[in-house]
Structure formats: C-alpha cells, structure tokens
Amino acid sequence: MLGKKVVVTGVPGVGKTTVINGAMERLATEGVAYKAVNFGTFMFEVAKKENLASDRDEMRKLEKDVQKRLQQAAATGIAAMSGEANIIIDTHSTVKTPTGFLAGLPEWVLRELMPDIVVLVETDPDQILMRRLGDASRARDMEGYRAIAEHQEFNRAVSAAYAMYTGCTIKIVRNENFLLEQGIDDLVSVLR
C-alpha cells in the first residue's frame, strides 16, 4: 500500500516546522511513522552543489528558470523517497521573489508528488511578524501586517488550485501564540 503524502505549507515564520515536529513526536508514540522532508532544504542542497546559493534565503533571489530547475530536482528526489512510507513535505505554497510570487508547487512538481492532503499552517499576521523579528537565524525580508496577510490569502488561493489539479484535500491548521498544542492536535488528526 502506498504511503500518505502530506504537504504542509505556511508563510515564513508561521511555525509550520514546529507544528510538524510536534505532530511527528506525538504520532511516533502511537506507532504511526512519518518521514519529514523539507522541500527548500532539498533544493538548497542541489543549489549549494552547483555554487548557486550559500544559504536557503538566497534561493528566492535566483533567476526564475534556475528556481524551477531546482524545484524539479527536489520533486523528483522526494517522489522517489516516498513509495510506501508516509511522508510530510515541509514547503511553501508560494515563495515571494523580487519579481512576484512563485508557486512553490507548480504543475511539474505536483505531477511528481501527487499529495493526498495540503495543510496550510496559518496564524494572525501580527504574530508572524513578531516571530520573524525574533528569529535572528534567518535573513528574511521585512514585511508588514498587510503583506503577510496578502501572502497567506494568496497561499489559500494557490492551494485551492493545487487541490483542483491533484484531487487532494486542504486543511487549515492554526498555530496561534500559546496554543501550539492545539495546532499539533489538528495536524495529528489529519496525519492519522
């Protein structure tokens, strides 16, 4: 039997990786195994080998054709890993580039991955802004409340298009400040 392929997305700073890690820990205690793969890290490893970027945050500033090629390489590699295993693909529905939004899962990526579920991790834009300001480990572009809200809205629209193409379902999981456990519970219920 094929494993479940779940794409978990969210704008930078929403805490999607934190929610994923919490859900995986909880599921492991129940004997439900998932492998988490970060799509951007997979792309970055290819970019680094080709001397295209020295950190993940530089990738969104690469030429669009280069980003597309890196996406394809990541999709092919991740699809080959999935097989019968349950897999979580930690990624972004859209990536904000200097020339506009780039679909994180364009048609050629979706064709390779064919996810069962797309999860959008969201929270209030002001919470995301504060998280970004407190994260010195990343070189993120500074955006205000309105830009973050627009990015989340655009992610919803793009995710609906992903569902139209693949037939997957969409689930929104909230990662509110001080309510991480509730977000983890919601993701666990989808992953079971």
From Swiss-Prot:
Q: What keywords are assigned to this protein?
A: ATP-binding, Cytoplasm, Kinase, Nucleotide-binding, Transferase
Q: Which reaction does it catalyse?
A: AMP + ATP = 2 ADP
Binding residues for ATP, per the UniProt record? G10, V11, P12, G13, V14, G15, K16, T17, T18
The answer to whether the entry has keyword ATP-binding is: yes
Where is it predominantly found? cytoplasm
Superkingdom, according to UniProt?
Answer: Archaea
Database matches in InterPro entries: Adenylate_kinase_AdkA, P-loop_NTPase
Enzyme class, first EC level, given as a word: transferase
Q: Where is it found, in Gene Ontology cellular component terms? A: cytoplasm
Query: Which GO-annotated molecular functions does the record name?
Result: adenylate kinase activity; ATP binding
The places in or outside the cell where this protein is found are: Cytoplasm
**Enzyme Commission no:** 2.7.4.3
Report the family membership: Belongs to the archaeal adenylate kinase family.
User: What is this protein called in UniProt?
Assistant: Adenylate kinase
